[in-house]
């Protein structure tokens, strides 16, 4: 009997690995402020066309015009600082989202005051107040016919979800999500205790936290890296302080605009937190990298995630 020839097994060839060239994103496009501008712009567009915000196109145009013009004038006071209009655009969008007035002058004047405060009200190299917050308080105190309308957002779950999503994109890029979530923890905890004390249904609590104004404040205002504490522990303490003042303002004084007033009143405490917990100051850089911390101080430690990873690798 003839022998059966052996069956030759086919050879399996592994796929060839092709290494694609790395695509470098231009430095200007990796700036987190562009993400914030896009997010606020989408929210403003949704508010105007979906929520029917009571703001006229002329008010928005004048807000941008006066903010950008004031920023250009302020550069004369600080000729050595890097020049960028992105922060002024963010302030203009924030004022357009929150400020309401029955005349055309309130918005541009508030915008000019907000941008001017960055150059005039400074302490140890940092501007003291969040520009949008200062502009809102200035309008409420000085400009008649002005008000802040937090109720315009309603309690729409979809809008709340988009605000949180956009906010997380921004805060993660600048490593400031800790202050946003800490504020929501303390403020939400105060609301929860009040609901329990009054014997209300927990649907009231979730209804309050779904307010777009609270989420916009948490992710786009208190998280401002230029006016917040430098150290993580300072940011946690500051968020707790702002949440406490906001709760006291709203539920003990029964006054309006507790969030805005709380951030304004607590602003002078930021230098105190920086003195207790020294850390390197945040600065916007021109390289547009994911790490936006300028190591200006050689003695103060930096507690951001990138520096922590570098320290572990060095050890």
What are these regions (language model features)?
Residues 2-75:
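N-terminal signal-anchor module of multipass membrane proteins
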Residues 15-38, 190-297, 302-304, 315:
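C-terminal transmembrane helix-loop-helix hairpin of multi-pass membrane proteins
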Residues 40-46, 67-71, 87-96, 110-117, ...:
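Hydrophobic, membrane-inserted alpha-helices
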Residues 52-65, 98-109, 146-161, 204-214:
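Structural signature of hydrophobic alpha-helical transmembrane segments
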Residues 68-80, 113-127, 165-175, 219-229:
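C-terminal ends of transmembrane helices
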Residues 80-154:
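Membrane-interface helix-loop-helix junctions at boundaries between adjacent transmembrane segments
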Residues 132-136, 180-189, 235-243:
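Central hydrophobic cores of alpha-helical transmembrane segments
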Residues 143-200:
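Internal active-site segments that recognize and position negatively charged phosphoryl groups
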């Amino acid at each position: 009997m003839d022998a059966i020839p052996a069956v030759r097994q086919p050879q399996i060839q592994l796929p060839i690995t092709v290494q694609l060239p790395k695509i470098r994103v231009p430095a200007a496009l990796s700036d987190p402020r562009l993400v914030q501008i896009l997010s606020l712009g989408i929210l403003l567009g949704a508010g105007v066309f979906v929520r029917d915000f009571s703001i006229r196109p002329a008010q928005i145009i004048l807000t941008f015009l006066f903010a950008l013009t004031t920023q250009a004038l302020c550069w004369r006071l600080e000729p050595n600082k890097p020049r960028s209009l992105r922060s002024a655009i963010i302030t203009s969008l924030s004022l357009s989202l929150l400020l309401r007035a029955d005349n055309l002058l309130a918005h541009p004047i508030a915008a000019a005051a907000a941008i001017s405060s960055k150059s005039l009200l400074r302490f140890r190299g940092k501007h003291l107040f969040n520009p949008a917050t200062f502009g809102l308080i200035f309008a409420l105190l000085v400009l008649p016919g002005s008000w802040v309308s937090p109720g315009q957002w309603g309690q729409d779950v979809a809008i709340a979800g988009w605000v949180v999503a956009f906010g997380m994109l921004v805060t993660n890029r600048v490593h400031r999500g800790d202050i946003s979530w800490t504020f929501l923890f303390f403020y939400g905890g105060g609301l929860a205790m009040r609901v329990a004390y009054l014997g209300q249904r927990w649907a009231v609590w979730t209804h309050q936290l779904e307010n777009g104004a609270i989420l916009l404040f948490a992710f786009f205002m208190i998280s401002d890296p230029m006016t917040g504490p430098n150290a993580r522990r300072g940011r946690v303490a500051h968020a707790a302080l702002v949440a406490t003042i906001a709760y006291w303002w709203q539920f003990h004084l029964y006054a309006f605009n507790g969030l805005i007033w709380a951030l304004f009143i607590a602003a002078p405490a930021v230098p105190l937190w920086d003195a207790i917990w020294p850390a390197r100051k945040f600065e916007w850089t021109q390289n547009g990298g994911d790490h936006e911390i300028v190591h200006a101080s050689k003695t103060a430690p930096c507690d951001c995630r990138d520096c922590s990873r570098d320290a572990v690798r060095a050890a």
